Amino acid sequence: MEDDIAALVVDNGSGMCKAGFAGDDAPRAVFPSIVGRPRHQGVMVGMGQKDSYVGDEAQSKRGILTLKYPIEHGIVTNWDDMEKIWHHTFYNELRVAPEEHPVLLTEAPLNPKANREKMTQIMFETFNTPAMYVAIQAVLSLYASGRTTGIVMDSGDGVTHTVPIYEGYALPHAILRLDLAGRDLTDYLMKILTERGYSFTTTAEREIVRDIKEKLCYVALDFEQEMATAASSSSLEKSYELPDGQVITIGNERFRCPEALFQPSFLGMESCGIHETTYNSIMKCDVDIRKDLYANTVLSGGTTMYPGIADRMQKEITALAPSTMKIKIIAPPERKYSVWIGGSILASLSTFQQMWISKQEYDESGPSIVHRKCF
C-alpha cells in the first residue's frame, strides 16, 4: 500500500501511543500519552507559550507543567485531552490529513460501550475520517503472533488483561482484568529504592525510576532462592548513573520489583498474580478449548519485556494446570509493539477492506454502528 492512501493504525495505550501506517512492520511514532499544562502564568511576553503540550514535548518541559494521562487503566477518561493526543498524532507525528485515510483504533478489552461510540463520533465529526474501525488490543497481539486461537496476557503501563480468543473472537465472559501494570511497578520501585536511602518523589523523578526499571529489572525463576543469592553475594548488583552524575547501586530490587506481578500482596493488593489470573481465565472457558489455550499462551505489552518472565510463567502455569497438559508460553521479541503490528497486519488484509465503517454508514446510523461492525 502507498502511504498516500494507506490506513493509519493508532494504538492508544495508558502510557505510550503507538501510531503509523498499515503495512509497515513497526510504528513510525511512539510517544508518551500525556498532556501537560503550565503550572505557572507565563511572564515573558512573546515567548509564544502554549496552553497545552503533548507527548515528548510535555515530557521535556515536565519541570514547569502538570502532567495528565487521559487514559487510565487502558480506558479513556478525559476526552478533551484524548482529542489533543489524536490531533498531535495526525498532524505533528505522522503529518497526514486524517480526512484522507481510514483509521484503525484499538481499545481495551471490556471497554464500555459508550466509549467506543465516543471514539467513533470524534473520528468522523472532529477529524472527518473517510472510514474507521475499532479493534480489541489483545486480539491484534494474537494476530501478530500468527494465531487466531490462544490466550493473550497483555500487560502495559496502566492495566493487565488476560483474554482468551477462539478462532479470532474474544470470549468476553472469560476475560479478566488486573489493575496492576507498569506504572504500579515503577511506583513500587520508587518505594523500595527510598528504603535504600535514595529519594525519588516528583513526577519527573518517576520517569528516571521507570528508566532504571526498564534497564535493570528482571523476573526471578525462584524468588526465595534469588533473595538468598542476593543476600550472600554481590553478583546481582548493578549500578546506574543518574542525570546529575550520581551513581546508585541496585541489588535485590532488580527482581523484587517485577515479582509483584506474581505476588500482588507486595503492593498491598489482594488480587491474584498474572499466572493465576491467566489460569483462572482459561478455567472460565469451555473444557474443549482449554488445551488450545494452554498451548498458545501469548505475552504482549511493555510490562512483559522483563528477562525471565516467560520461563517463570511456564513454571507457574505448569504447577497449576493438569500434569499431562502441554503448556507453551510465546513471548515474541517485538511484543512491546505487537498490538500495533497486529493492527498493521489486519488493516492491510484485502479481506478486511469490507469491514471498515464508512462515513456514509456513520451518517445513516450514528455512533451505534460501531457495535454492529466491530466485534
UniProtKB/Swiss-Prot annotation:
Modified residues (Methionine (R)-sulfoxide): M44, M47
SMART domains: ACTIN
Keyword match Nucleotide-binding: yes
EC id: 3.6.4.-
Protein name: Actin, cytoplasmic 1
Principal location class: cytoplasm
Gene Ontology annotations for the cellular component aspect, listed alphabetically: actin cytoskeleton; cytoskeleton; dense body; focal adhesion; nucleus; plasma membrane
Molecular function via GO: ATP binding; hydrolase activity
Modified residues (N-acetylmethionine): M1
CDD domains: ASKHA_NBD_actin
Pfam families: Actin
Modified residues (Tele-methylhistidine): H73
Quaternary organization: Polymerization of globular actin (G-actin) leads to a structural filament (F-actin) in the form of a two-stranded helix. Each actin can bind to 4 others.
Miscellaneous section: In vertebrates 3 main groups of actin isoforms, alpha, beta and gamma have been identified. The alpha actins are found in muscle tissues and are a major constituent of the contractile apparatus. The beta and gamma actins coexist in most cell types as components of the cytoskeleton and as mediators of internal cell motility.
